[in-house]
């Protein structure tokens, strides 16, 4: 069973992802957060296999959180999902250790497909 943690400031998006992922075999959403600080605390305790991470979060950016996750637990797969797919965000995310980078508006289904693998 692949354990997933969702980090996005949009409650609607977290709910949508949770509902979609609950239909995917061998995938379990073990937690979710709307900000980076709560997410980091939860991730340290819950130890997910994969984190779905938005870039724009209250308090700290998703890219900063990504760096902290990878420094602490480099084997966690981190999928960046954003509405702001600017080239500089993509480059910063990959440099910080992102495993995938998706536009959550245009490539939402691709996120789900990656998790099915």
Give names to the regions the model predicted.
Residues 54:
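Active-site residues of response regulator receiver
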Residues 58, 86:
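The feature encodes the CheY-like receiver
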């Amino acid at each position: 069973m692949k354990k997933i943690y969702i980090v996005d400031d949009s409650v609607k998006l977290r709910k949508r992802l949770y509902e979609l992922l609950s239909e995917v075999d061998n995938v379990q959403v073990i937690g979710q957060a709307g900000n980076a600080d709560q997410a980091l605390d939860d991730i340290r305790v819950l130890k997910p296999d994969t984190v779905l991470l938005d870039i724009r979060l209250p308090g700290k950016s998703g890219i900063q959180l990504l760096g902290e996750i990878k420094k602490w637990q480099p084997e966690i797969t981190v999928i960046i999902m954003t509405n702001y797919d600017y080239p500089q965000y993509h480059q910063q995310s990959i440099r910080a250790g992102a495993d995938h980078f998706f536009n959550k508006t245009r490539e939402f289904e691709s996120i789900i497909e990656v998790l099915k693998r």
